[in-house]
Amino acid sequence: HDGLVEARPKSGYFVRRPAPGSDVPLRRARLVMSPTRVAVSSGVTAVMHSMRDPAVVPLAAAVVAPELLPIRALNRILSSLAREMSTAGAGYDPPPGLRALRRQLARRSITWGLGLDEDELVTTVGAMEALHLALRATTRPGDAIAIGSPTYFGLLQLAEEMNLRVIEIPSCVGTGLDIDALEQVLSHTPVKAVLALTNFDNPLGALMSDANKERLVRLLARRDIPLI
């Protein structure tokens, strides 16, 4: 009755496209100056188990429907690579990752305006391993980190596992992390690292403007705080 669902003849029921200017503003998180410990693992585990139930629509995580992925094309590529793989594919790579891959990434970094050396790069098995390594390098158990709110639950799990305390920084759908709020927190509370998802963050999908990105970098550089 709220106009969120519409019936289409001989097709079924569908979510109605929102009318222009009908966006509902999200309630922003309350700014708390003191860091807190998080305990989310049990709840996250329950949610992940529920996603395996075919009777449950998985709205709790940003998971792509398998039918939208090019599974057949990926399988063909993997099969081709497996047939052509040398004996090197059965061994161990150095801890920073396959040198040939890091060399190609270093070459590509020129187009990013960086010009990195292959020895400056570390490849990881997904983003969460990269975040774990970055936090290990910049924090110790008990330290405080700043994270946008709302955020991806995996980041809170990671903080919990590493015994880190978290300060939530309000985020907006249109602009991302509230830099004014972050600056206010940094003026009152020692923070060892700031974890910011600046491009289409999860779950809001916010894109921080280039001007705000530059402001964020300048703010943390002045205070010598790592930006992850």
Predicted segments, located by residue:
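Residue-level marker for buried hydrophobic side chains located in beta-strands
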Residues: 227-228
